[in-house]
Amino acid sequence: MPEVKTEKPHLLDMGKPQLRMVDLNLLTVFDAVMQEQNITRAAHTLGMSQPAVSNAVARLKVMFNDELFVRYGRGIQPTARAFQLFGSVRQALQLVQNELPGSGFEPTSSERVFNLCVCSPLDNILTSQIYNRVEKIAPNIHVVFKASLNQNTEHQLRYQETEFVISYEEFRRPEFTSVPLFKDEMVLVASRKHPRISGPLLEGDVYNEQHAVVSLDRYASFSQPWYDTPDKQSSVAYQGMALISVLNVVSQTHLVAIAPRWLAEEFAESLDLQILPLPLKLNSRTCYLSWHEAAGRDKGHQWMEDLLVSVCKR
């Protein structure tokens, strides 16, 4: 009698959470509460009642085995675990949203929030241009700007906590896209009253002068590329938090500074500055627009990318 083979039933690993047992609608509630950090406002955004949102938050706490949100003043404050989850949840929801029928992006009616990092000193020239363009053609869209990179910027781009970065830094990892927008000429700036400088310097003379710089301790400091050795750093006499304050100090002292030509020209008359060619190999910097590749499939992200390129590219 032939042996009859029977298939063994597939047993679920009950020790692991099963996705089919998770109410994925709770993730949209989590996303809204994270953005609003207020139950009432999140309920309004979602078109739900406040008790329904509170109930969903209670279920989320059980799902993730964490408090997620704690009371803080008149609102709530996310826990460390909530912040850890936020980027992944947003990215997952956005990927699903992009595949739904009719998921087009209409800028004239959208109330979307975009988070941009326009790094100093570029924020001095680009932030107002971007803000005014968005306000003109998409008045309901809200753009939130910040002006510096930090150690978490790649993480923020990866999870779309920051959608775009405009800076002199190129993101070289394969998962990021960096598009060159323009190249800035760099110049040497000194006071017109400087006792030793009244014309162009030779390369060997640059570091014989004392320098004012953007703090070299800051992450991705604008000034850092020119002060990458102990000898060059020994010429630094003043470190400020922003390039405008650096130029202000230069105008009142015998220090010199390196700056983009457009910024030096903007303040040359009011601060009585002289602008000289920079006789160093690094005498220009490329400005890049950068984002994470996963965000590129989002239609709203594509719209903002096109707008930023049209505003910023020279």
Curated annotation (Swiss-Prot):
CDD domains with a match to the protein in the record: PBP2_LeuO
Biological process terms in GO annotation: positive regulation of DNA-templated transcription; regulation of DNA-templated transcription
Transcription regulation as UniProt keyword: yes
HTH lysR-type domain mapped to chain residues: 22-79
Family matches, as InterPro entries: LysR-type_TF, LysR_subst-bd, Tscrpt_reg_HTH_LysR, WH-like_DNA-bd_sf, WH_DNA-bd_sf
One GO CC term on file: protein-DNA complex
GO molecular function annotation: DNA-binding transcription activator activity; transcription cis-regulatory region binding
This protein's UniProt keywords: Activator, DNA-binding, Transcription, Transcription regulation
Superkingdom classification of source: Bacteria
UniProt DNA-binding region: 39-58
Protein family (similarity comment): Belongs to the LysR transcriptional regulatory family.
Name of the protein this chain belongs to: Probable HTH-type transcriptional regulator LeuO
Organism: Salmonella typhimurium (strain LT2 / SGSC1412 / ATCC 700720)
